[in-house]
Amino acid sequence: MPKLRSATSTEGRNMAGARALWRATGVKDNDFGKPIIAISNSFTQFVPGHVHLKDMGSLVASAIEEAGGIAKEFNTIAVDDGIAMGHGGMLYSLPSRELIADSVEYMVNAHCADALVCISNCDKITPGMLMAALRLNIPVVFVSGGPMEAGKTKLSDKLIKLDLVDAMVAGADSNVSDEDSAKIERSACPTCGSCSGMFTANSMNCLTEALGLSLPGNGSMLATHADRRELFLEAGRRVMALAKRYYHQDDESALPRNIANFKAFENAMTLDIAMGGSSNTVLHLLAAAQEADVDFTMADIDRMSRLVPHLCKVAPSTPKYHMEDVHRAGGVMGILGELDRAGLLHTDVFHVAADNDGTPGSGTLKSVLAQYDVMQTQDEKVKHFFMAGPAGIPTTKAFSQDCRWPSLDNDRQEGCIRSREFAFSQEGGLAVLSGNVAENGCIVKTAGVDESNLTFVGSARVYESQDDAVAGILGGEVVAGDVVVIRYEGPKGGPGMQEMLYPTSYLKSRGLGKACALITDGRFSGGTSGLSIGHVSPEAAAGGTIALIENGDRIEIDIPKRSIKLAVSDVELNARREKMHSLGPMAWKPIGRQRYVSLALKAYAMLATSADKGAVRDRSKLED
């Protein structure tokens, strides 16, 4: 039987000092011997997705203590990608993922915690905590802060739904009046919570459900809704149940690496493709898989992208649906149910929402779907749960409203979630492209690409930084037919792999959204749509071909054939490569770029791998 990890600091006379310190935190005599459950919170007043999390740790703790555990909360950092966007702050976003993972590991291992609840929400926080949870491999439950309500405003007497990207595009569009731009800005982000579309934060919170590490509704229940309170309480109860199964019953199915195994990663990626999730999820799933010692690679993603249909279309891919609409249609469990009926899901994987009593099928995703898939459940409480809707009242308070939709969206022919027969498209919302531009692959969010742009041929317009590209787009350098190339923005070359939401938004605002393509070794916000191809690997700073592209080069993109090609002969490419090598210390570095890079970012860059490896640390440089 596994011994409680916390016994290291709570048992034996030689631990009298540690026990004295535990007592100073509020631990009583009769508490020693109980499991110590770490609560990793990420409250901050900087981020709307986290501004309401201050009291959530206490809520989880109350359920843990009622179930017989000791709850101890700590906090991690949280960067708001939207506020950090478009300036030097974005260099810190992806590296913060590694800091979050490390900080969770440090706190949990330093204090010998027995299990973990992760209270996350936004872009790098959920992935960072996921990496830590799989690294630690102790019982864990994820519970996020939830999505914000979609914005709503009237323009020309017409009520429209909005999100963050609408505010950015309107602000850069000279055809939008100052009055309308201000109205959109004030309405786009009305409540606390992660931005309201299928952007990175919501995509990742949905994927934790598919991985089996969070409860049904985690990815879709609004931050403002009173029903979300129960998710926090249940997270506390479930982590205690998992801890008892592992430490008292020697049940290793309660451990995250036995839940989030290869099949579970396939489920998560299948969901991601089906719902047209953010391309950043590829980066984070690859990173998490490495922490779990799961051999899940770009080749698996490429294979799956050809098989999985696009079943759920949400902003920014359409203005019609937001996360509140996904929830009304059954949330993640509704999408997984359709994937199961299409024969595309592994339902024999374990899930934290299900008890494993040893009988066949118990503790698995199959049993969770039987209860929570709105198309098959007979549980009226579950149906009531998925009818939770928005109130339309601006607020930063969690659980501040209890509005309901009049009915569920069970329309699998024309609704928010479709069956395979009526899919938005028979190929999914993400694709892996490869060719001489990206020998190790690159990612495009096909859910946001207009059908007319699935094949594209254009002339390269090369920029050595995002800043230069923005200036070029707004200054009129970029014209219809161009392929904007932004390089040296990868994990190592940026460093930090900036998001390119501003360049893509400005292309739209100038009427070039369907007339140009953009490729980069950086990445894109979950709010990006259009022919935007990121994660080019190897990156420019690692010797990738993207560093050899010159202005005017012909670039051919063919999404159906999964191809991206620089139409330059091998002889010419080899000559360019030799010329680059001849530059010595200046080889594979941006020409003329003026950018301050702090010591912290330089340390990150020294160990960073390219995007096809998840932009994680290069372990070969750390292992003996």
From Swiss-Prot:
<dbReference type="GO" id="GO:0009097">
    <property type="term" value="P:isoleucine biosynthetic process"/>
</dbReference>
<keyword id="KW-0456">Lyase</keyword>
<comment type="pathway">
    <text>Amino-acid biosynthesis; L-valine biosynthesis; L-valine from pyruvate: step 3/4.</text>
</comment>
<feature type="modified residue" description="N6-carboxylysine">
    <location>
        <position position="124"/>
    </location>
</feature>
<dbReference type="Pfam" id="PF24877">
    <property type="entry name" value="ILV_EDD_C"/>
</dbReference>
<comment type="pathway">
    <text>Amino-acid biosynthesis; L-isoleucine biosynthesis; L-isoleucine from 2-oxobutanoate: step 3/4.</text>
</comment>
<dbReference type="InterPro" id="IPR042096">
    <property type="entry name" value="Dihydro-acid_dehy_C"/>
</dbReference>
<keyword id="KW-0028">Amino-acid biosynthesis</keyword>
<comment type="function">
    <text>Functions in the biosynthesis of branched-chain amino acids. Catalyzes the dehydration of (2R,3R)-2,3-dihydroxy-3-methylpentanoate (2,3-dihydroxy-3-methylvalerate) into 2-oxo-3-methylpentanoate (2-oxo-3-methylvalerate) and of (2R)-2,3-dihydroxy-3-methylbutanoate (2,3-dihydroxyisovalerate) into 2-oxo-3-methylbutanoate (2-oxoisovalerate), the penultimate precursor to L-isoleucine and L-valine, respectively.</text>
</comment>
<comment type="subunit">
    <text>Homodimer.</text>
</comment>
<feature type="binding site">
    <location>
        <position position="81"/>
    </location>
    <ligand>
        <name>Mg(2+)</name>
    </ligand>
</feature>
<feature type="binding site">
    <location>
        <position position="123"/>
    </location>
    <ligand>
        <name>Mg(2+)</name>
    </ligand>
</feature>
<keyword id="KW-0100">Branched-chain amino acid biosynthesis</keyword>
<dbReference type="InterPro" id="IPR020558">
    <property type="entry name" value="DiOHA_6PGluconate_deHydtase_CS"/>
</dbReference>
<feature type="binding site">
    <location>
        <position position="195"/>
    </location>
    <ligand>
        <name>[2Fe-2S] cluster</name>
    </ligand>
</feature>
<dbReference type="GO" id="GO:0051537">
    <property type="term" value="F:2 iron, 2 sulfur cluster binding"/>
</dbReference>
<feature type="binding site" description="via carbamate group">
    <location>
        <position position="124"/>
    </location>
    <ligand>
        <name>Mg(2+)</name>
    </ligand>
</feature>
<dbReference type="GO" id="GO:0005829">
    <property type="term" value="C:cytosol"/>
</dbReference>
<keyword id="KW-0408">Iron</keyword>
<feature type="binding site">
    <location>
        <position position="122"/>
    </location>
    <ligand>
        <name>[2Fe-2S] cluster</name>
    </ligand>
</feature>
<keyword id="KW-0460">Magnesium</keyword>
<dbReference type="GO" id="GO:0009099">
    <property type="term" value="P:L-valine biosynthetic process"/>
</dbReference>
<dbReference type="GO" id="GO:0004160">
    <property type="term" value="F:dihydroxy-acid dehydratase activity"/>
</dbReference>
<dbReference type="InterPro" id="IPR056740">
    <property type="entry name" value="ILV_EDD_C"/>
</dbReference>
<dbReference type="InterPro" id="IPR000581">
    <property type="entry name" value="ILV_EDD_N"/>
</dbReference>
<feature type="active site" description="Proton acceptor">
    <location>
        <position position="525"/>
    </location>
</feature>
<feature type="binding site">
    <location>
        <position position="499"/>
    </location>
    <ligand>
        <name>Mg(2+)</name>
    </ligand>
</feature>
<protein>
    <recommendedName>
        <fullName>Dihydroxy-acid dehydratase</fullName>
        <ecNumber>4.2.1.9</ecNumber>
    </recommendedName>
</protein>
<comment type="similarity">
    <text>Belongs to the IlvD/Edd family.</text>
</comment>
<keyword id="KW-0479">Metal-binding</keyword>
<dbReference type="InterPro" id="IPR004404">
    <property type="entry name" value="DihydroxyA_deHydtase"/>
</dbReference>
<keyword id="KW-0001">2Fe-2S</keyword>
<keyword id="KW-0411">Iron-sulfur</keyword>
<dbReference type="Pfam" id="PF00920">
    <property type="entry name" value="ILVD_EDD_N"/>
</dbReference>
<dbReference type="InterPro" id="IPR037237">
    <property type="entry name" value="IlvD/EDD_N"/>
</dbReference>
<dbReference type="GO" id="GO:0000287">
    <property type="term" value="F:magnesium ion binding"/>
</dbReference>
